[in-house]
C-alpha cells in the first residue's frame, strides 16, 4: 500500500458454482473492505450466475488454459457477460496449455496478475479520499482549476478547498506542534545548506523590497511552521486535539494536494518550495516517510498525475515544468560541444520553479552503486543523506518571489530510467493521459552549466531523453515536446508505462501519445 504495509489478500469462504455461492462470497468480501476481485477457474462455472456484480470492485478472471476442462470457455463467456452489463473486467489467459494437475501460475499470467493488482490497489486507496486545494488558481494555469466532477466520477476523490488565510491563522495562533517545530527547524538548519543568493548586489525597486514582510533571517522559521501546518491540514494531527484544537486535529482525509502560491501568496510571503519538495520526497526530519503527491501552483491535474505515479510505484513523484527542447544542433551552437549517449538525439529541460522531490537528484544508490529512485520504504540513511547533500537551497529570486523563501536547487546527476506522464482534460473527450518512457541524462558539466544558466539556475534541473519510436508523437525528441499537452509533467522512477496504462484503463482514462 501507499503507506508501505503489505497488501492484504482474502479468499472466499467457498468455491463459487451458483448465484447463492456468489452472494455468500460477496457478503464476506463486503466485511473485509475488498476493493478488487480475482476469479480463478480451470473449468466451466455458469457465466453470469457466478460473476462479480458489485460495481464497486475492480474485476479480473484467470481462465486456466487446459484441455480437460473448459476454463478458457468460461473466461470468454463471463467476459462477454461483463461487457454486456457494462462492468469493466480484466481477462487473464495463459499462453501455453497446462496439464490439469499443474498448480503453478505461468510467468505471463503472473505478470498480468501483479500489474492488475497494482492498479486495483491504487483504485481502492483513492476511493473516498480527498484532493486538498490550498488556494485556488495560480496565474491562469488551466490545470489549477479543480474539476470536482472529474475527481468524483473517475477517481472517487472528494475535492476539498482551504483558503490561504487558514495557514496564516494557524501560524498567528500557534496551531501547530511546538515540539515537532523545534525538531524540524533543527534538522533544516543542520541539513539544508543554503546556495547562492541571486538577489545579492541588485538594486531592487521599492515595490519589491517593501513587499517582503517576513525578515530574511526569519524565512526558515516561517517555512518550518508552514510545512507542519500544511501536513496537518492534509492528514490531521492528534497532537492538536491535546492542545484544544479538536476540529483542526481531524485534517481533510487527503491523499493528494496542491498549493497555489503564485502570486497571491508569494508576492509578499515566503514561497512554498521547501514545503512542496519535502512533502513529495521520501524522507523528512523524521527519516524515511510516505511521499505526498503535492502540486506546485495547485496544478490539480499534475497533482493527480503525481498520485497515479506514486500509487503504482511507491516512489516519490517529481513535479516539473516542461521547459525547453534542446536539439543537438542548438546545443552545439551554444556550447560548442555535442550531446552523446542517451542525450544524443536531443533533450528536454525539466525544471520546476523551485520545488521537486529530492529523490529526483538520483543520489540514492542501487546495489551496483548507480544512481536510482527507490520505493520509499527501501530508502537507507545513506540514501537520504546523499539526496540532502546533492541539494542546496538558494534564496528565492525576489523578482519572481517578492516574499522570499528558498528554492530546492539540484541537478539530476544520474542516468536513470524514468516515466513522464500528465493528465489533461479535453473538451468533448474528457480526461486523457500522456505517457513517455525515457532516461534522465547526466550531461558534461560544461554543457549543463551553459544551458542551465540560460534559465533560472536556482531551480532543480533534470535533463530528459524520451525513448523514440520514429512514429507520431515519438518521431523525435522535438515531437515529444511539441505534443506535450500542458506546461507541467511528472516523472517517476522506472519504466512503468504498462502499469500506468493498466491503472488508467480501470479509471476509464483515455490514452494518447504513448
Task: Place the predicted regions along the sequence by residue.
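Cofactor- and metal-binding active-site motifs of prokaryotic enzymes
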Residues: 14-127, 140, 271
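Alpha/propeptide regions of enzymes that mature by internal proteolysis
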Residues: 2-40, 44, 51, 56-58, ...
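A charged, amphipathic alpha-helical module
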Residues: 4, 116-268
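C-terminal structured domain segments
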Residues: 405-495
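Conserved small/polar residues in nucleotide/adenosyl-binding loops
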Residues: 512-514
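Catalytic or ion-translocation cores adjacent to nucleophile or general acid/base/metal-coordination motifs
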Residues: 61-77, 86, 160, 274-311, ...
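C-terminal catalytic subdomain
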Residues: 283-445
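Short beta-strand elements in bilobed, periplasmic/extracellular small-molecule ligand-binding domains
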Residues: 1-15, 89-94, 157-162
Amino acid at each position: 500500500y501507499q503507506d508501505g504495509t503489505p497488501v492484504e489478500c482474502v479468499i472466499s469462504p467457498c468455491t463459487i458454482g451458483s448465484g447463492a455461492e456468489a452472494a455468500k462470497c460477496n457478503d464476506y468480501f463486503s466485511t473485509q473492505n475488498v476493493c478488487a476481485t480475482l476469479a480463478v477457474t480451470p473449468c466451466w462455472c455458469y457465466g453470469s450466475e457466478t460473476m462479480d456484480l458489485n460495481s464497486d470492485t475492480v474485476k479480473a478472471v484467470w481462465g486456466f488454459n487446459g484441455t480437460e476442462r473448459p476454463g478458457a470457455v468460461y473466461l470468454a463467456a463471463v467476459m462477454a457477460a461483463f461487457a454486456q452489463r457494462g462492468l469493466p473486467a480484466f481477462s487473464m489467459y495463459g499462453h501455453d496449455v497446462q496439464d490439469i494437475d499443474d498448480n503453478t501460475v505461468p510467468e505471463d499470467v503472473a505478470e498480468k496478475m501483479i500489474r492488475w493488482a497494482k492498479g486495483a490497489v491504487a483504485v481502492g486507496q483513492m476511493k473516498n479520499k480527498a484532493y486538498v486545494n490550498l488556494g485556488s488558481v495560480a496565474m491562469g494555469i488551466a490545470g489549477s482549476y479543480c474539476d470536482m466532477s472529474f475527481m468524483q466520477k473517475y477517481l472517487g476523490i472528494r475535492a476539498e478547498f482551504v483558503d490561504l488565510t487558514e495557514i496564516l491563522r494557524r501560524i498567528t495562533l500557534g496551531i501547530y506542534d511546538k515540539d515537532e517545530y523545534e525538531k524540524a527547524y533543527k534538522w533544516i538548519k543542520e541539513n539544508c545548506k543554503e546556495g547562492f543568493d541571486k538577489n545579492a548586489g541588485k538594486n531592487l525597486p521599492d515595490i519589491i523590497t517593501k513587499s517582503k514582510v517576513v525578515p530574511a533571517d526569519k524565512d526558515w522559521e516561517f517555512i518550518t511552521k508552514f510545512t507542519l501546518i500544511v501536513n496537518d491540514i492534509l492528514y490531521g494531527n492528534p497532537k492538536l486535539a491535546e492542545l484544544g484544537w479538536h476540529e483542526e486535529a481531524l485534517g481533510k482525509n487527503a491523499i493528494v494536494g496542491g498549493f497555489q502560491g503564485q502570486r497571491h501568496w508569494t508576492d509578499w510571503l515566503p514561497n512554498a518550495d521547501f514545503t512542496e519538495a519535502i512533502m513529495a520526497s521520501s524522507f523528512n526530519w523524521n527519516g524515511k516517510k510516505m511521499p505526498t503527491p503535492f502540486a506546485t501552483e495547485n496544478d490539480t491535474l499534475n497533482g493527480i498525475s503525481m498520485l497515479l505515479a506514486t500509487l503504482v510505484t511507491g516512489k516519490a513523484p517529481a513535479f516539473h515544468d516542461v521547459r525547453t527542447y534542446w536539439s543537438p544542433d542548438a546545443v552545439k551552437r551554444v556550447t560548442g560541444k555535442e550531446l552523446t549517449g542517451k542525450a544524443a538525439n536531443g533533450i528536454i529541460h525539466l525544471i520546476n520553479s523551485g520545488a521537486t522531490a529530492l529523490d529526483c537528484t538520483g543520489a540514492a544508490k542501487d546495489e551496483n552503486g548507480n544512481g536510482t529512485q527507490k520505493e520509499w520504504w527501501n530508502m537507507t540513511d545513506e540514501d537520504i543523506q546523499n539526496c540532502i547533500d546533492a541539494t542546496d537551497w538558494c534564496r528565492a529570486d525576489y523578482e519572481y518571489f517578492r516574499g522570499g523563501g528558498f528554492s530546492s536547487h539540484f541537478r539530476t546527476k544520474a542516468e536513470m530510467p524514468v516515466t513522464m506522464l500528465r493528465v489533461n482534460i479535453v473538451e468533448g473527450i474528457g480526461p486523457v493521459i500522456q505517457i513517455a518512457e525515457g532516461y534522465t541524462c547526466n550531461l558534461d558539466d560544461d554543457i549543463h552549466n551553459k544551458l542551465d544558466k540560460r534559465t533560472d539556475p536556482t531551480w532543480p534541473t533534470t535533463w530528459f531523453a524520451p525513448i523514440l519510436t520514429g512514429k507520431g508523437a515519438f518521431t523525435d525528441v522535438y515531437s515529444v515536446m511539441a505534443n506535450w499537452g500542458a506546461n507541467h509533467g511528472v516523472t517517476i522512477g522506472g519504466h512503468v508505462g504498462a502499469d500506468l496504462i493498466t491503472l488508467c484503463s480501470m479509471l476509464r482514462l483515455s490514452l494518447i501519445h504513448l
